[in-house]
Regions:
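Glycine-rich FAD pyrophosphate-binding loop
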Residues: 2-21
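Active-site substrate-recognition segment that forms the wall
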Residues: 2-5, 57-62, 168, 173, ...
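Short, flexible, mixed-charge acidic loops at enzyme active sites
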Residues: 17-25, 106-107, 246
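Short glycine/proline- and charge-enriched loop/turn segments
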Residues: 22-33, 248-256
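Dinucleotide-binding Rossmann-like beta1-alpha1 core, especially the glycine-rich loop
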Residues: 25-102, 112, 230
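Surface-exposed helix-capping loop/turn segments at secondary-structure junctions
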Residues: 51-61, 83-90, 139-142, 155, ...
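Flavin (FAD/FMN) cofactor-binding and adjacent substrate-gating region
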Residues: 71-145, 151-157, 162
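Predominantly flavin-linked oxidoreductase catalytic cores and closely associated redox partners
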Residues: 123-209
Length: 273
């Protein structure tokens, strides 16, 4: 689009299920609890998602709000408030009574507080990826799927890429977005990166299914212990998504059995919920 010559590589055929870029709906939030320095990146991301949605007939992003619930004064709540103050993000600070009266599915304890990010919502990753791939091809990008990069070298002149099949490519700049394979491609930099197993669940509500729909429930996260939380996304058609934030063990992405769910995975999540 900007007149550059671009080549893209993926070791699988996108959109695929080998990264964090699938699952029909993914959480997006603007007033970031982990640091206000992320907000400018998020502002630009929102712009691009809405622009993509305007250019297509596909649902790319949906704003439903994002609610964080924790004990008053928790770092997770204060981080959201700080990001809001620095970057003028739209939030609401809610008491436990406010939360109970607004949403039927919540029953927080009295010492808990909520912060609602009004721009929280969902991004629909398969639509995003397919649309961006189609647009990039239309602008002249060269895309190589099922192609694994085995090595890259950067010097004063250019970047060299080598594929597992022995092909070599040269360029001026390199952007690496390899997800769980990032430590392998950046091992010479000795960065403190490790891959953690994450398990997500989708539940079908037995009763009162309407209260779990996006129009009746925001994305929500609960800090059930200091620094430990679960996050839940309403039903966008495949069920209610729920997961524990982090707390997984370190894995090798090439050796991980992605189809195996341990009995304790679901048991722990259900006990927290």
């Amino acid at each position: 689009k900007n007149g550059m010559s671009v080549i893209g590589f993926d070791m699988y055929n996108p959109p695929h299920t080998m990264g964090s870029s699938h699952g029909k709906a993914r959480v997006i939030r603007k007033s970031y609890s982990e640091g206000s320095h992320f907000v400018p990146l998020l502002n630009r991301s929102y712009e691009l998602f809405f622009e993509l949605q305007d250019q297509t007939n596909l649902e790319i992003i949906k704003i439903i709000g994002g609610l964080m619930i924790a004990k008053k004064g928790a770092n997770s709540l204060e981080g959201i408030k700080h990001s809001s103050e620095v970057h003028n993000c739209e939030i609401e600070v809610l008491t436990s009574n406010d939360i109970r009266s607004r949403w039927k599915i919540f029953n927080p304890e009295e010492e808990m507080e909520g912060v609602l990010d009004l721009m929280g919502g969902a991004v629909f990753p398969e639509n995003v990826i397919n649309t961006n791939l189609n647009f990039s091809k239309g602008y002249g990008a060269e895309l190589h799927f099922n192609t694994k990069i085995s090595k890259w070298i950067s010097d004063d002149n250019y970047v060299t890429l080598k594929t597992e099949t022995g092909d070599t490519y040269y360029g001026d700049k390199l952007i690496i977005c390899s997800g769980a394979w990032l430590p392998n491609l950046l091992k010479d930099l000795k960065l403190p990166i490790f891959i953690e197993r994450q398990v997500l669940f989708w539940f079908d509500p037995i009763n009162n299914s309407e209260i779990f729909l996006p129009e009746n429930s925001p994305n929500h996260s609960w800090e059930y212990e200091d620094g430990k939380m679960i996050y839940i996304q309403p039903n966008f058609g495949d069920g209610i998504k729920a997961a524990i934030h982090h707390e997984g063990y370190e894995v090798d992405p090439d050796k991980l059995d992605r189809k195996k769910i341990h009995q304790d995975d679901e048991k722990k999540l259900r006990s927290i919920i």
